Amino acid sequence: AFMALMNRVFQPYLDRFVIVFIDDILVYSRSVEDHAEHLRITLQTLREKQLYAKLSKCEFWIDQVVFLGHVISKKGIEVDPKKIETVLQWQAPTNVPEIRSFLGLAGYYRRFVEGFSIMAGPLTKLLRKGVSFHWDDHCQQAFEELKRRLTSAPVLTLPSGRGGFVVYSDASYQGLGCVLMQHGKVVAYASRQLRPHESSYPVHDLELAAVVFALKIWRHYLYGETFQIFTD
């Protein structure tokens, strides 16, 4: 209810210079001048709606912020170091609920890891109905590789304006993968495992499935844009 209220209050400014999550308000701008105006509008809106922010919990004019498990700065977006520390300390799962917990945390940052779903395959297989839990060398290797990739995750660029998007997609009988780039910098990675019926597809159909997957998952960036897409 409170989240819905905040979204209504800031609806004219959402995704323009304001992001709201429950009672957290993030104001972002491209220049100092813009930021001064955006802050004025945000604070004035709160005042008009008789909503009050506690000064001790506010931070103003910062060039880096931790928000929803990410560090956002002018360099781009990266994984919160505190979350990386949690990943490093994670012990190998000994049952299905522990696998779910690990994949829940790791999956939250899947956009930072190229081929995440394919890499996690040995772990997700243990989540299937009727499959007995057996942690073998393939599972351990996948677990360690996911931890390594997450703890060395790259800084992803934040999309800037319109145009310049390029999509690279690929497919194999292990899964589908794609990369979204803008002006030569990585915006996000995406991947998924094959669905049961797709395992019988010829390779060229899988390549097309990867293209469709990329266009669907990044449609909010690509809709109405002219862009390039490369596939095998």
Task: Give the ranges of each region predicted by the language model.
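RNase H catalytic domain
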Residues: 181, 191, 212-232
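Short, flexible loop/turn motifs enriched in small residues
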Residues: 171-174, 223
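Active-site palm subdomain of RNA-directed nucleic acid polymerases
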Residues: 1-36, 116, 216-227
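Two-metal-ion RNase H-like nuclease active-site motif
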Residues: 164-171
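Short beta-strand scaffold segments in enzyme catalytic cores
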Residues: 176-180
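C-terminal reverse transcriptase regions that engage the nucleic-acid substrate
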Residues: 5-8, 14-16, 21, 41, ...
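A short, polar/acidic, helix/strand-boundary loop motif
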Residues: 1, 182-209
